[in-house]
Amino acid sequence: VTCDLLSFEAKGFAANHSICAAHCLAIGRKGGSCQNGVCVCRN
């Protein structure tokens, strides 16, 4: 999942990070965040 496609902000809240974290949780990781336009999951 690339964060560039999901990137938008509402009142300072970056929704792409939440979508990335949800994606990572869905594949069994402990969450994640966007780094340089790429969703990086935590182990």
UniProtKB/Swiss-Prot annotation:
Keywords: Antibiotic, Antimicrobial, Defensin, Disulfide bond, Immunity, Innate immunity, Secreted
Compartment annotation: Secreted
InterPro entries from the UniProt entry: Defensin_insect, Defensin_invertebrate/fungal, Scorpion_toxin-like, Scorpion_toxin-like_sf
Keyword presence, rRNA processing: no
Disulphide linkage map: C3-C34, C20-C39, C24-C41
Gene3D superfamilies linked: Knottin, scorpion toxin-like
Domain of life: Eukaryota
PROSITE patterns in UniProt: INVERT_DEFENSINS
Entry's Gene Ontology BP terms: defense response to bacterium; humoral immune response; innate immune response
Function (record text): Antibacterial protein. Strong activity against the Gram-positive bacteria M.luteus, B.megaterium and S.aureus. Reduced activity against Gram-positive bacterium B.subtilis and weak activity against Gram-negative bacterium X.japonicus. No detectable activity against the Gram-negative bacteria E.asbriae, E.coli, P.aeruginosa and S.marcescens.
Family to which the UniProt record says this protein belongs: Belongs to the invertebrate defensin family. Type 1 subfamily.
UniProt protein name: Defensin-A
